[in-house]
Amino acid sequence: MMAENQDRGRRSKWLVVGILVAALSGVAYWFLVANASPDDRPEGTLADIASLRDRDDLNVLFVVIDTLRSDRLSAYGYERGTSPTLDYLSQTGVRFDQHRAQSSWTKSSMASLWTGLYPIRTDVLRHTDAVPEVAVLPAEIFQEAGFVTGGIWRNGWVAPNFGFSQGFDIYQTPAGQQAPASMRSEAKAGRIDGTDIDLVFTATEFLRSNMDERWFLYLHFMDVHQYITTEETAVFGSTYSDIYDNSILWTDSQFGEIIMELYRLGLASKTLIVVVSDHGEAFGEHGAEGHARDLFSEVTLTPFILSFPFRMAQSGVVRSQTENVDVWPTVLDMLGLPGLEEPDGQSRVELLLGRQPTPRLDLGFAQLDRNWGQLEKEESALLAVRKGSLRFIHDVEDPERDLLYDIDMDPAEQRNIKDERAAEVQELLEEAERHLALDPLWRGGSESVEIDEMQMRQLRALGYSIE
């Protein structure tokens, strides 16, 4: 085992070096550096995407990279080469260009991602809330279809007692591995044990153990949230924002280890890869740093990338607005599996295949209770409503602080046009009020769970104030 770990360490070092070369040179085809095998997936077309539902050999790798805003990825046009692995998957797959999460803190966002329901309908809004057992989650659908289901996570907000382990044969935090001596965490608040090296090691063991089975594997990377980087990947500078970019490059290299393992095991040509995030990160664009405080675009614009068991001859870009609630309706539809229970999200497969026009007037919502970590305080709700090019942020406590942006003209949301567009504000306010009046899908709403002192310390170690 020691020799195997040393061999893995050498491979990891060379992969980091190779991806670093790719990042600095602007080369997305990182297979050509890092002593990697050529991409032996066959070439595919839209017709092959439509035919995925007919395959009986397909695996699904579902990757959540925590705290990852899409505009910091070179795959999404960022000027720095932060994400050569994701670049390659995007260039040979499909990228959803205007994609948003449903909240700016993990548990509420992940509840919406897994169920396809908006936060108002999951009722997972506060730190003691949990997804109820009656909910139907994707892992249960895969399990029923005969897949081996595995989940490997490092964020305490997706722990089993919050309802996220439903349907998983294996649902675990990874065992600790030795980290490089040059590794460091620059997180301003909070520090959790381990690194994504641990996750990669455990994921590799899962892939090797189940390479002859059909599997569904969920990986939740955390090193971007923790601002972890190494000497080799600390190439973009030393400000807090620079360190965030460095940590994306580091995490991208670790994700690259998983991709390389798929090739080594002969699984790349029969694996669908889905990459998303739970929320982004702020760097003072609207006065705040971090996340879980507001709903501006820097904390809600997130990636959604699909990589297929074949290389698309031409990369696909879906420019319509999509959301995390659409992810699982899309993936399950693509695979021909049963859908979620009454989701708010919708399958985007037809849109992906070019069979329907761009739905410019689709409504989208994100929600945050600013007092989510303080049970003794009343709810302090923010609701973002997106309709066409307009994005309305409604402060339920104080509507005088409502904001309106034209995200086509002002994607950074720097110019509040509320006073200039009274009719649109009224229309969007009515949409917000209708949305907030919705009932949870499940009778009684979310469950409330007790959090013991050890788990509370672990959650506070993420950097949050919880009372």
Q: Predicted segment positions?
A:
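Catalytic domains that recognize anionic headgroups
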Residues: 2-467
